Amino acid sequence: MDYPGNLFVVAAPSGAGKSSLVKALLELDSHVQLSVSHTTRAPRGQEKHGREYFFVSEQEFDAMVKADAFVEWASVHQHRYGTSKRAIEERMAQGADVVLEIDYQGALQIKKLFANAISIFILPPSWDELRARLERRGEDSADVIELRLKNAAIEVAQVHKFDFVIINELFDRALFDLKAIVHSQRLKFSAQRRARAETFKALHIF
């Protein structure tokens, strides 16, 4: 189905800066809305239920899987994450641009179900910098950091399957690139014809 809103799918290895970039984008562009996923992991830091994620139990997650409530779900770092199809479609139907923060497995599943979804992969500038960021975050033990780096190698190997790639070396530059991708989709013919219908009509463009 052709919705007036766009769907942006943003994936990255842990520590690449995906969440920080998406948060900054949301603060700058009120037309972009975050699709909040469900997860079985515990909240981190200042995270709140319903804002960053819907935090649910394993049993609740199982029930949603059985009810076919997710457009995709995957296991990441020993926890499960799922995306509600209904929530995405309702927001896009209202004309909002929806952004999904998701792992690469989920991103590729979303692309199969939403053919027009725009996929974006965030890369770190180097492996050393990725390790340093994970260590500076101070949230994980040394063993967990090693697991995240191991998983990151698997995730980065999928980068060629994405539409756009942003290297997050300088945050402001990476944010500029992310904003440019979002804006470019709004300038496509179909989007402009819908958003500027009166102008197109006056110019006899149908």
Swiss-Prot record:
Pfam families: Guanylate_kin. This is Guanylate kinase. It comes from the Bacteria. Residues 5-183 form the Guanylate kinase-like domain. One of its GO terms (cellular component) is cytosol. Its main location: cytoplasm. One of its GO terms (molecular function) is guanylate kinase activity. InterPro entries: GK/Ca_channel_bsu, Guanylate_kin-like_dom, Guanylate_kinase, Guanylate_kinase_CS, P-loop_NTPase. Gene3D superfamilies: Guanylate Kinase phosphate binding domain (3.30.63.10), P-loop containing nucleotide triphosphate hydrolases (3.40.50.300). Essential for recycling GMP and indirectly, cGMP. Keywords: ATP-binding, Cytoplasm, Kinase, Nucleotide-binding, Transferase. NCBIfam families: guanyl_kin. It is found in: Cytoplasm. It catalyses: GMP + ATP = GDP + ADP. Belongs to the guanylate kinase family. ATP binds at residues 12-19. Its EC number is 2.7.4.8.
